[in-house]
Amino acid sequence: MNYADDFVGCFQYKSDAEQFYERVKHRMGYFGLSLEEEKSRLIEFGRFAQEKCAKRGTKPETFAFLGFTHYCSQGKNWKFRVKRKTSRNKFAKKCKEVHRLIGSMRTLTMKEIILRLNSRLTGYYHYYGITDNTPGVKKFRYNVLKSLFYWINRKSQKQSYNWNELLNNAFRKEPGAGKPHVWFLGEVHLIKGASTRPGKKRHLPEI
């Protein structure tokens, strides 16, 4: 049996939030469960909280939920809107995971490394590639490139790539094949003999 171990309750009035908090603890105790006090808290959040904090010269609190930091901000029309970005802890964890992943693949060819990276990164961007999180996505891409640059240059004592070479396209041609293999190292994508129909463009997902 799986339990939902994270949840967020939203209330307009502080008294309602406090009452809910106490009732949840009582209800969970009935089933022999308890709240993690260190991870449970009441915060002032939302449009009214932003207005109050502006008068006090402070910023509203933020909270982390499901890998995202939720914070008060404004949309393009200057109206209040909750925005989300990758939480600091999750970002650091994912960067370390990818760094170790690339390190474990350093004996493979560049083609194999990029193919495996694509599979991992596709899942990352399907989850974290949401509205307002573009800066976080680009930052993650940059860290992936740094890790790739670090590990491919450890494969031999002589440096394999400089930074500019890594950001530019590296072209390879398979022996006896008529179509070139194009490695988009700057985007960490591999295209093998890609072709498109006339009048249509092939769009690659950003990393």
Positions of predicted regions on the chain:
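Non-catalytic terminal/accessory segments
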Residues: 1-207
